[in-house]
């Protein structure tokens, strides 16, 4: 049996193509229902996310070409695109390369945002669906569980998921460094920019107590306040609101400063000098830089956040090198296990034959064994079983070892001939 993987990802295909393979579309059968009917395919996994669509199957090695063509035809039909158009988007991997790719995917090394945790859950969900459809067996079960173990090892032994790699998450990271805990804090959004909205969403997930939204257009402020279950205010109210907020995210890009040093200083006096975290992601800047010189005020602009993001991204790239080494080691372990499958039937038959001889000889001794006590009879049986295990140990260990060196089939054939094993 061989392993074959066919797929496309954000690296090889546009979203307009990938979304055609979504599992969420109504009135569509699951691809596994079709794949399981294809000749020569024994096991299958179908993974469909926003950023990738992949089919992993185990099939007879001699039928690999036909299986590949069949899967591509099925994907073209499902996506409603020509085979030629689909071919430009696809990659095809087999054997150890397919296993390596799956390990990298599960470990988030192949993700759009390297280190993100969602992909592992998506792979587990795809595996659950494959199990429910009855299209998994010894090979895919082993590979998938191994992939989960590899992903866990990568996450615990490297810093691949450490630190923020988006401006929104960078804002959360900085806020945590300043305040420690964010639950109970209050946010003021000034302006309705996309980045400020994303930053606010990330902060709200940390248990933020409430949010104020100020905008030049009050209708837009009301709209955003409704999204965040907050309160809309006009820009003129910002100096007054400053006294009661902990975090300000500003993104108006106005020609003049929306928050001046004097406004911030006045607010600090009324706040009894509680910390104030100002995030200015506007271009041109919304907050007068001198405001950052005030005690207990922490001012960061878009360049500061981007520097942090770049530093964190470089850190993840360094950690990715460690992760790749782990994956190479685990691919080697999988290959070693896979090579033993060729000799397993011989080992099983060898054990059955030797145990059969033992049972036959014990049967011949039934007449005199009856004169023994029950305890002594058990001792005899235990002794015979121990002798069998010792006889079996060296040959089977040698056979497994040689299978890892790709000599397994030759040694298995020799063992079968020596002991006249049937199959």
Swiss-Prot record:
What pathway is this protein said to act in by its record? Porphyrin-containing compound metabolism; protoporphyrin-IX biosynthesis; 5-aminolevulinate from L-glutamyl-tRNA(Glu): step 1/2
Q: Which residues form the active site?
A: 50 (nucleophile)
**Ligand binding (NADP(+)):** 191-196
Keyword list, A-Z: NADP, Oxidoreductase, Porphyrin biosynthesis
Q: Which family does it belong to?
A: Belongs to the glutamyl-tRNA reductase family.
What's the entry's take on its domains?
Answer: Possesses an unusual extended V-shaped dimeric structure with each monomer consisting of three distinct domains arranged along a curved 'spinal' alpha-helix. The N-terminal catalytic domain specifically recognizes the glutamate moiety of the substrate. The second domain is the NADPH-binding domain, and the third C-terminal domain is responsible for dimerization.
Put simply, this protein is called Glutamyl-tRNA reductase
List the gene name: hemA
